[in-house]
């Protein structure tokens, strides 16, 4: 049985035309893009702050900045959060609890360091025996927000940069892109130190009566700064400070055993 010949070309040289009703209903993408699109639209930050910068983060919850338009809903449990914003000063005493919260967060998880104190130690980096000089010594930081304190607009800009970073990454490659030059772990060998300012310097003999060698160099007698009665009162106050410092040391040692 013969059939009529079909003179239409099945495989034309030119590109095939896609009907408009078909092009408006088909999207070409990959599973990674869909996965990242879902994650950037549902970033759940942890409600965690260590100092004053957290007040600026709390301002984002209000209607003026409205972080919920980014799909950000604050969570009180680290097991329900995938973003931790480190806001404020990180001390040696809070380093271990902060690391414990980070370990309890499910993968993939991200960290934003907010404020000068969290990035470099800030004004506490000069002579503070307890401040941590940068949170990147403890956790892998994804975005840094400089400022003292940063404005809520800067936090939104950091969230936008984090969303771009999430959109361009692959879940298979994230484990290979972890920082390797930091020592962010429990075994960071950082131990709390006893307080340095105990008031014992007030008991020094040369504090009230200059040393004899200084008087010989100057060629004149240097009188004492305090009278004997005042020195006796100062000695009593110094003994009280020493007693208080001992109580503080004992309380400090007992609290450090908890960690």
UniProtKB/Swiss-Prot annotation:
Cofactor note: Binds 1 [4Fe-4S] cluster.
Protein name: NAD(P)H-quinone oxidoreductase subunit K 2
Domain of life: Bacteria
Pfam short name (any one): Oxidored_q6
Class in the EC hierarchy, top level: translocase
Assembly: NDH-1 can be composed of about 15 different subunits; different subcomplexes with different compositions have been identified which probably have different functions.
Subcellular location, principal: membrane
GO cellular component: plasma membrane-derived thylakoid membrane; respiratory chain complex I
InterPro entries (UniProt xref): NADH_UbQ_OxRdtase-like_20kDa, NADH_UQ_OxRdtase_20Kd_su
General function of this protein: NDH-1 shuttles electrons from an unknown electron donor, via FMN and iron-sulfur (Fe-S) centers, to quinones in the respiratory and/or the photosynthetic chain. The immediate electron acceptor for the enzyme in this species is believed to be plastoquinone. Couples the redox reaction to proton translocation, and thus conserves the redox energy in a proton gradient. Cyanobacterial NDH-1 also plays a role in inorganic carbon-concentration.
Binding sites annotated in the UniProt record for [4Fe-4S] cluster: 52-53, 117, 148
Membrane topology listed for this record: Peripheral membrane protein
Similarity section: Belongs to the complex I 20 kDa subunit family.
The keyword 4Fe-4S appears for this protein: yes
Gene Ontology MF: a single term: NADH dehydrogenase (ubiquinone) activity
PROSITE patterns: COMPLEX1_20K
GO BP term, example: aerobic respiration
Phylogenetic classification of the source organism: Bacteria, Bacillati, Cyanobacteriota, Cyanophyceae, Gomontiellales
EC number(s) on file: 7.1.1.-
Sorted UniProt keywords: 4Fe-4S, Iron, Iron-sulfur, Membrane, Metal-binding, NAD, NADP, Plastoquinone, Quinone, Thylakoid, Translocase, Transport
Cellular localization per UniProt: Cellular thylakoid membrane
Listed cofactors: [4Fe-4S] cluster
């Amino acid at each position: 049985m013969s059939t009529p010949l079909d003179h239409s070309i099945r495989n034309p040289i030119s590109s095939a035309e896609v009907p408009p009703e078909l092009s408006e209903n088909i999207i070409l993408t990959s599973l990674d893009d869909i996965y990242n699109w879902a994650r950037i639209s549902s970033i759940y930050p942890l409600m965690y702050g260590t100092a004053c910068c957290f007040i600026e983060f709390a301002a984002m919850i209000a209607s003026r900045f409205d972080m919920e338009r980014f799909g950000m809903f604050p969570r009180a449990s680290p097991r329900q959060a995938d973003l931790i914003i480190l806001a404020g000063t990180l001390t040696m005493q809070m380093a271990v609890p902060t690391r414990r919260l980070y370990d309890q967060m499910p993968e993939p998880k991200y960290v934003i360091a907010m404020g000068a104190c969290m990035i470099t130690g800030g004004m506490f980096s000069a002579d503070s025996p307890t401040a941590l000089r940068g949170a990147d010594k403890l956790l892998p930081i994804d975005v840094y927000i400089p400022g003292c304190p940063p404005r809520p607009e800067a936090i939104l800009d950091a969230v936008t940069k984090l969303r771009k970073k999430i959109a361009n990454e692959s879940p298979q490659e994230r484990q290979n892109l972890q920082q390797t030059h930091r020592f962010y772990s429990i075994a960071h060998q950082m131990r709390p130190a006893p307080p340095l300012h105990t008031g014992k310097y007030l008991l020094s003999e040369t504090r009230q009566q200059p040393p004899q060698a200084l008087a010989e160099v100057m060629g004149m007698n240097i009188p004492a700064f305090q009278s004997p009665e005042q020195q006796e009162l100062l000695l009593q106050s110094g003994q009280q400070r020493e007693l208080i410092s001992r109580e503080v040391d004992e309380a400090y040692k007992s609290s450090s055993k908890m960690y």
